[in-house]
């Protein structure tokens, strides 16, 4: 009985490690697919892209025309 429980626990841990590695690789692929970024006053969409470059953030004051604005060092 203990052997079966030990085997199940080990199998679960191995599966968990494999799954974690798969998710991490998937995130790396996703980051690579994001592509380039857009600069100030260019149209953006945080949820689907294009994304704002570093130093800018996407604001949707006039939805659906969201634009990148300078974060002024915030």
Swiss-Prot record:
Subcellular location(s) of the protein: Secreted
Disulfide bonds: 37-53, 44-58, 52-68, 60-66
Residues modified as Asparagine amide: 72
GO cellular component assignments: extracellular region
GO molecular function: sodium channel regulator activity; toxin activity
Record function comment: Insecticidal neurotoxin that modulates the insect Nav channel (DmNaV1/tipE (para/tipE)) in a unique manner, with both the activation and inactivation processes being affected. The voltage dependence of activation is shifted toward more hyperpolarized potentials (analogous to site 4 toxins) and a non-inactivating persistent sodium current is induced (site 3-like action). Interestingly, both effects take place in a voltage-dependent manner, producing a bell-shaped curve between -80 and 0 mV.
Extra remark beyond the main annotation: Negative results: does not affect mammalian sodium channels (Nav).
Organism name: Agelena orientalis
This protein's name: U3-agatoxin-Ao1g
Comment field on protein domains: The presence of a 'disulfide through disulfide knot' structurally defines this protein as a knottin.
Signal sequence extent: 1-20
Cited PROSITE patterns: MU_AGATOXIN
Matching Pfam families: Toxin_7
Highest rank taxon of the organism: Eukaryota
């Amino acid at each position: 009985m203990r052997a079966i429980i030990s085997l199940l626990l080990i199998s679960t841990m191995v599966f968990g490690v494999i799954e974690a590695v798969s998710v991490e690789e998937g995130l790396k692929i996703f980051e690579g697919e994001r592509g380039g970024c857009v600069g100030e006053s260019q149209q953006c969409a945080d949820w689907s892209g294009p994304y704002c470059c570093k130093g800018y953030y996407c604001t949707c004051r006039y939805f659906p025309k969201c634009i990148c604005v300078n974060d002024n060092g915030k």
